């Protein structure tokens, strides 16, 4: 009888390997689409070294195994070794490769080696792997090709409706109500199709920016649609807390007040401080009255679980290994799992260095910096007495995540979900924001000259104009203070552009003329989010400084801090509108910051 069963499956697909990798190397999705059962973590059993103990139940038999970390090199190969502690299999190894062909296709080779542990294994392996898995794998590969061509990668692999007749009627009714308030007919149709035909894995965590990119659509418009869909009971929103290392979910809450300032990642066994600018993102899921989405884990360690990691390999204790690698230019980190330090790696087209040589010692060494060309040899040495998991990962944060910092500066969110605030006493870092304060010069005399009712009408009109222009420039009105507003933006340029447009529009409307003129000040820097009077507000030195800048405006002028003025995007924008503005640099002390003088820049809108 055979001691090892070996299988080699081969496919040829139309897409380039980088594109097909996103589905094929998503082993959680692939296992789901090929009818494998959900898995569970066996918390009571400790794995050896780097491995984890997992289990599933198939045909009434509980199978338990010890799984080593997946190994991969994006987008060319991945594999895993499983050593079984119960069930009909003793050991199984999977190894997959993707190779580009001269005619633009991708050759896929999927190899499996399985060792039976008993008589049942000799019977089950040929049936399950040699026949059933081969059939299911081929079906999934064919469907993936179709989905990529049709740009429907989130749709159920067999394009089956997931809704009952009652659920369809309920969805249509709510979608019709949504359309009355959010005039995005084609987007709503696509969203309905996604909710009806999307698979559970895709719908368990809807990222609006990810969907926008897949549909070739505007990110902010998709976010707006999802927010309105939540308001009308089509979707529910959640706040996901992400681990800074593996970037996986560590917690989910439905309201900002339920966020804790500290969190723990079980997978990485690390504690971390939660912040708004990276570690909290808004996601959506269908409202359960329309569709119940239930997703278990089908695989917990495949390449697409941590897609920012382009390389992951186990290096045996005392071993030295070489790898030929090819990655796109950018910033990366080279780390050993469990280590506190990371080596910085910059891949640069202009570099003539084609070798990266790193030694991991028993004690963490200081972080080093390396520069290599896109094609390089990686020589890695593990001089410790334990196996090491060596990782190369992109340092750039998740591009498809709509972070809490960004969402909190989105006007639609503040209009629809003003009740979403932090718990009192809880503060979250939001990274750097552009903070804007305005005031109206001449408002006091206006009230005296034309009367309270007429003057108040002017002020309200000016608020509406500012709010709309701020929103159009990706900012949000945080609060009004008398005749003034406070607004926040992710980018200084957007804040400046909104004020230039506001001065012009107010002037055209007749508000920013005569004795009533707009004053504004903008500063950019670190801030924290707080609950102030049941409003999601910002606090810190950046806010305090920004609040004091508009006093230097003489009307129709925007005061910029030096940080804002020297921002690259701001500099380019000022060159674009140089015929519309006049710039003057001034030096002055600022109240509350008396120990130093500041360079400020008056931007007069002509």
Q: Which residues does each PLM region occupy?
A:
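Intrinsically disordered, glycine/charged-rich C-terminal tails and inter-domain linkers
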Residues: 555-556, 562-606
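Catalytic core of nucleotidyl cyclases, primarily class III adenylyl/guanylyl cyclases
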Residues: 52, 437-438, 469-497, 501-542
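Catalytic NTP-binding/metal-coordinating core of nucleotidyl cyclase/transferase enzymes
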Residues: 419-420, 424-498
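Beta-strand/loop substructures that line and gate deep hydrophobic ligand-binding cavities in soluble
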Residues: 81-135
